[in-house]
A protein has these predicted regions:
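Short glycine/proline- and aromatic-enriched beta-strand/turn motifs that initiate or cap beta-hairpins
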Residues: 19-74
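Short loop/turn motifs that connect adjacent beta-strands in outer-membrane beta-barrel proteins
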Residues: 21, 31-41, 76-83, 142-150, ...
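Glycine- and aromatic-enriched membrane insertion/assembly motifs of diderm outer-membrane
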Residues: 51-52, 59-117
Length: 238
């Protein structure tokens, strides 16, 4: 995942550098360009794949999902509106699916992941939710029309954990019972804050995003040292 994220950041950086070099020969007097119709805030929606880096022997499966929604406020640089800074609040959610694994989220001594072939799970996932604030440094090739042109963004986001729960649907347990749901909500072992590096590259209203968490998911000594990551699609006007 680190290599994928590095590729996205590299594309963002190279795209900005290439466009800046091209503009040196054809400078625009932005004081004469009408930017009054450019929106200063936009809803940003992201959906994609969520995973864990350095997960060790923990068995995950299927397509684990991430969904993020932010209201971003965009502040163009007056001397060059192709460059801008954006910040805004929102929510970030991840759903990690496990394979033949029993997760004890409420263990007082730390989260445990135990391989279990006796219990047959139809669904078994860890769902987390964060209140987040992303900060992006952006470049757009068409600042007067934010629905078109190439766009690049790099930055970081900080989040506060608001929810953590294990949701399971059991087909058959060790006692021969099945067809029931279990939900354990407990954040005692979760790291209360997370910091992640983020990047986006795309055209028009669609872009590819990548995120890599720089902090551990669980508190030190209370769970494995896993680092969540995500990749997917972004829908936004900026």
């Amino acid at each position: 995942m680190k290599s994928i994220f590095v590729i996205i950041l590299t594309c963002c950086t190279l795209g900005i550098v290439a466009q800046e070099k091209k503009e040196k020969s054809t400078k625009t007097d932005w004081s004469k360009v009408d930017l009054s119709k450019r929106a200063s805030d936009h809803l940003l929606l992201q959906i994609g794949y969520a995973g864990w880096g350095d997960k060790g022997t923990i068995q995950t499966k299927g397509f684990s999902k991430t969904f993020n929604a932010y209201v971003m406020f965009d502040f163009p640089i007056k001397s060059n509106p192709k460059l801008s800074v954006a910040i805004g609040p929102g929510i970030g959610t991840d759903n990690i699916n496990f394979n033949k694994t029993t997760v004890d989220l409420a263990n007082k001594t730390g989260v445990t992941f135990t391989a279990d072939s006796l219990i047959q799970y139809k669904k078994n996932k860890l769902a987390t939710g964060y209140l987040e604030v992303p900060l992006e440094f952006r470049y757009s090739t068409k600042p007067t029309d934010m629905n078109a042109g190439w766009k690049f963004a790099i930055g970081a986001k900080i989040g506060m954990n608001m929810d953590a729960k294990i949701k399971s649907k059991i087909d058959l347990d060790a006692n021969g019972r099945g067809g029931y749901f279990l939900k354990t909500k407990d954040d005692r072992n979760m790291n209360g804050t997370r910091l992640a590096a983020i990047g986006r590259v795309g055209y028009g209203n669609l872009s590819l995003f990548g995120s890599y968490t720089l902090t551990d998911l669980f508190k030190t000594g209370f769970g494995p040292k896993v680092r969540p990551f995500s990749i997917g699609l972004t829908l936004s006007g900026l």
